[in-house]
């Protein structure tokens, strides 16, 4: 199915800038009409994990809309083995450099500075005893499925009506599922006051469109709700610069996807981590090594 013509007209108007202090729905409706505004907002529900992206800052939504509809090969890279393989490589490299990694240990106080705190804001609030560590984020129901493979299953589905999304990740990386099976992951932003069960029912209807007969083919299933764990959302009048600062003072630095750093989704975490690490190195009085790192 092709996207609405009004939406196509909108995303090809790439030289326009959007205001920070207006909501996206009213701004986009004024320039492109209500149909395009609704379709664009629902498309952006996929990358904001929010059921009503139209309420967000027009500049925030517009930047992301232009990113995800850019007329060039997508920036997505599928790493063989998934994120767990990336984390394993990072951990191995860190240990090679002398980093001591402890897992399964509860952290209830900060060590001597300089220190980097890389966690979601609710946990950072408690650890830093700082109630100002707040920002808006999404709320979405998640569904992971293992199904028997069948020809004709969709690789990806974007729901322009309800902002849902589905992707069959074992298509580009067959190592994610046993032979003859597929790994499917889907998400649906929850509406205000909507229960997990109601959100799952809407999401399951989307799954049926992309993976017909999935219920009788399912060999493994899990579901969850992600609340405040899907990145920062900027309301009208706010930008990434208004989010909680990376440098908290006294040698404490905060990194994550809801702090004052630019980027889309995981890019915020990466950019904030680089800035926080540089700040910590400087606070420790260590000369920063700018030599390129072997990859």
Where does each model-flagged region fall?
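Alpha-helical scaffold segments in soluble metabolic enzymes
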Residues: 27, 43, 89, 275, ...
């Amino acid at each position: 199915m092709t996207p609405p013509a009004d939406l196509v007209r909108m995303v090809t108007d790439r030289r326009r800038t959007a205001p920070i202090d207006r909501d996206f729905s009213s701004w986009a409706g004024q320039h492109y009409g209500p149909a395009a505004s609704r379709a664009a907002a629902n498309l952006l529900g996929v990358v904001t994990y929010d059921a009503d992206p139209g309420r967000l800052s027009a500049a925030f939504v517009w930047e992301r809309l232009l990113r995800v509809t850019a007329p060039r090969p997508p920036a997505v890279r599928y790493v063989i083995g998934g994120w767990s393989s990336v984390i394993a490589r990072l951990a191995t490299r860190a240990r090679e450099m002398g980093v001591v990694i402890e897992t399964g240990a509860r952290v209830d106080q900060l060590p001597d500075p300089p220190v980097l705190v890389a966690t979601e804001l609710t946990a950072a609030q408690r650890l830093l005893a700082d109630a100002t560590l707040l920002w808006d984020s999404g709320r979405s129901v998640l569904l992971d499925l293992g199904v028997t493979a069948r020809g004709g299953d969709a690789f990806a589905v974007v729901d322009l009506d309800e902002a849902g999304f589905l992707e069959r990740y074992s298509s580009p990386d067959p190592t994610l599922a046993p032979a003859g099976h597929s790994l499917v992951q889907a998400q649906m932003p929850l509406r205000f006051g909507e229960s997990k069960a109601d959100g799952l029912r809407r999401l399951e209807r989307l799954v049926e469109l992309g993976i017909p007969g999935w219920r009788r083919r399912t060999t493994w299933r899990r579901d969850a709700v992600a609340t405040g764990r899907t990145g920062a959302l900027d309301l009208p009048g706010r930008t990434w610069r208004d989010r909680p600062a990376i440098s908290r003072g006294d040698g404490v630095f905060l990194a994550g996807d809801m702090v004052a750093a630019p980027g889309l989704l995981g890019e915020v975490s990466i950019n904030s981590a680089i800035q926080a690490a540089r700040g910590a190195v400087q606070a420790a009085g260590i000369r920063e090594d700018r030599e390129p790192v072997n990859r």
